[in-house]
Amino acid sequence: MIKPLKSSRTGLLAGVFDPVHIGHLFMAHLAMEAANLDRVWFVPTHIPPHKDSAKVPYFHRVNMLEMALKEEPKFVLMELEREARPTYSYETILSVKHVLGEKPYFILGSDEWEELHNWRRYDLLVKNAIFIVVPRKPITVARPEAEAIFTDMTPINVSSTYIRQRVAKGKPITYLVPKTVETYIHENHLYYP
């Protein structure tokens, strides 16, 4: 049996990370500042339930995350969704809450906040997590049933899709991803046509 961790303020940033980029890292920093977090757990999704499948295999995405997080000791890779099946956020949140012994802080963009009521087991999400919302666009929905902290700064506007498109066109991705991730992408011919 896993013992609950000593009380700490832990943020969760779940995603496909296909690939991880500076926008993800900056979003985690914004969340740390807004909620005075002790650490952020990056949780790569093996099979995303809400999107088409990832473009590269899970092990490549995990390797890139390990490289990207190496320089920041408060950013930790947690393979909580490594099973080869769709894993829903409420499952991850319940698992983490059990380990921590308290509600985790779930980091998401305002676009996801707007759609949160459509997520599987919304009732369990709002009951078992505190949300940190990073504005990607203006927030138009109030969710009084959910505990939430809103950051006051917009994250860097970059997406994994944009990075994949640039790689496929032979364009540089310098400054969009950590240098180690850029090297890994090219050495492994990821996202090439």
From Swiss-Prot:
GO terms for molecular function: ATP binding; nicotinate-nucleotide adenylyltransferase activity. The keyword Transport does not apply. Gene3D superfamilies: HUPs (3.40.50.620). It catalyses: nicotinate beta-D-ribonucleotide + ATP + H(+) = deamido-NAD(+) + diphosphate. It comes from the Bacteria. Its EC number is 2.7.7.18. Pfam families: CTP_transf_like. Catalyzes the reversible adenylation of nicotinate mononucleotide (NaMN) to nicotinic acid adenine dinucleotide (NaAD). Belongs to the NadD family. This is Probable nicotinate-nucleotide adenylyltransferase. The lineage of its organism: Bacteria, Pseudomonadati, Coprothermobacterota, Coprothermobacteria, Coprothermobacterales. The gene is nadD.
